[in-house]
Structure formats: C-alpha cells, structure tokens
C-alpha cells in the first residue's frame, strides 16, 4: 500500500507502507527562475507501481 508522498531535497518520493521501499517519482528542476517537474518513467517505477496495484487488488474486497 502506498503511504505518502514526501519531498526529499529536489526529489518527490513515494513510500510503500508494507516494505518501506522508497521510489522517486519526480525531480524538481530550477530553470531560468521557473521550477519544472520531470516525471521518472523508469521501468523500475512501472514494475513497483504494478506490484502495488496488484497487492491492492488482492486485499481489496471490491
């Protein structure tokens, strides 16, 4: 189960409550007085996201 999103320096991180695993989902970039957010689209994040969704479906009596 995803717990919370928090900011760690210039990174935005999600944390899996069950495993404590942290995953960077965005990186803040300062560009000419503007802050840009770049989303991480790494295969590792996609695998993590799928695993979390599968666990949620398995435990959610919907």
Question: What residue ranges belong to the model's regions?
Answer:
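Compact, glycine-rich, soluble single-domain proteins
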Residues: 1-62
């Amino acid at each position: 189960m995803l717990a919370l999103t928090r900011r760690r320096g210039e990174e935005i991180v999600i944390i899996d409550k069950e495993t404590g695993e942290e995953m960077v989902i965005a990186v803040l970039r300062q560009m000419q007085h503007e802050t840009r957010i770049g989303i991480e689209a790494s295969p590792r994040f996609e695998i993590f996201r799928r695993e979390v969704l599968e666990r949620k479906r398995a435990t959610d009596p919907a």
